[in-house]
């Protein structure tokens, strides 16, 4: 056996140990936070974020569980704006039409997203590939000219952004979902990731109720 052949197995055990400690503390961490914890604990095993990401995928496949059940939150880049209100039970209502040009940041806590109470008076949901275009549309209050909900992941969608889009589709199945992406292979790939999910998240997507989103 090659000297480094055992490293992937050791990484899995190290991540399991760290997740066990996180769950005992009843906290959640992002993948980035987990990387820094592992970098301090075992720098020779986890020199980069890529090693952590791959090990998490291996662990999810091994245990047949979601990363959230391991205490790992989805990192989210997503923003939402427009004719939609969000309310976590017992908390104040967030009106996404009043969040300014930056929009409302989508939480990476998938349990929280599942609990949100949604209300909308939009006619369309529009996925916007580019963050700059999203900002321009929100500055111009486009969602009042054409009653709509705007959502962006600033490129390829993360799990949290895609899950909120799924929640919106589940709550308002009659709302058409449109996409504003570049007319090139990269834009098509982003559209397909929103619609079908990614290969990398395939082992977990169904656990979050993910389905084919009718974009």
Ranges and model annotations:
Residues 1-178, 185-215:
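Nucleic-acid enzyme cleavage-core boundary/entry regions
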